[in-house]
Amino acid sequence: MLNPGEPDVQGVLDVLASAIARHEGPWDTIDLRPLAADAPDFPALLNAFRKAGLAVQSYFCFGNWYLRVGGRSYAEYFEALPSQLKNTVTRKRKQLEKLKSRIVVCDSETGLEEALRAYEQIYAVSWKIPEPYPHFISSLCRTCAGQGWLRLGVVYVDEQPVAAQIWIVHAGIAAIYKLAYDERFAKLSAGSILTAHLMQRAIDIDKVHEVDYLTGDDAYKRDWMSDRRERWGIMAFNLRTPRGLLAAARHFGAGAAKRALGAVRRLFGGQT
């Protein structure tokens, strides 16, 4: 949240939380997520909100699997994978090579629109729920392509797109942002083949030091990654508004919310 070199993290957050608490505009809750709970500014933010008279609750968001490359080549990384995954990738890659298949990775504006159409076609027939903001992904990809950050991979079989993944590479980190495959071709394991292909590119060509699978504790992620960390959230409740007080009562129980309200009244001189 803050620059790690900030000399007075607690002081800065105290001022911020106090300004938020005293803001006259109507607000009920603040929900900050996802955050690194092991970062020094996480407990500092909790303390700042409490000192400002807000009811505060931290909560678990999700597990985050990631890979520490550690200077390895892709070959060294692949050799350390679970044997079942290695066998699947090796066997299915040979199977795909016997078919009329190809893998295309779009990393610039050239060919981007075709790659986006392929991704959207795959996504529409996958298990994924529809995007709430349909144009967001395409706009994000165009922005990333313009900056050289995009790695949009598509697997074609008989010129039909069957699997796609969106990776974003920046500052030495490859983030696996989106993936989907056509379930009618599930037996080909095209998604796994594409992951291996993009992983090789990220490690050997992009020279990343970390690959991040982002949100979720899906079982398959631990096979590809080396480490897991947690992301947490902080929710702060404005006890000076009816909705904020009601939300706090739902989260903490009516008794705890009532005690917190008493503390707020004392803090603000009896005004709520």
Annotated model-derived regions:
Residues 1-60, 169-229:
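Acyl-donor binding region in acyl/amide transferases
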Residues 7-9, 109-113, 242:
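A short acidic, often aromatic-flanked loop/helix-cap motif at beta-alpha or helix-coil junctions
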Residues 24, 29-187:
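A conserved beta-strand-loop-helix scaffold within acyl/acetyltransferase catalytic domains
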Residues 42, 47-76, 80, 206-269:
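Active-site/acyl-donor-binding loops of N-acyltransferases
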Residues 122, 180-182, 191-194, 240, ...:
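Short, charged/polar low-complexity linear motifs in solvent-exposed/disordered segments
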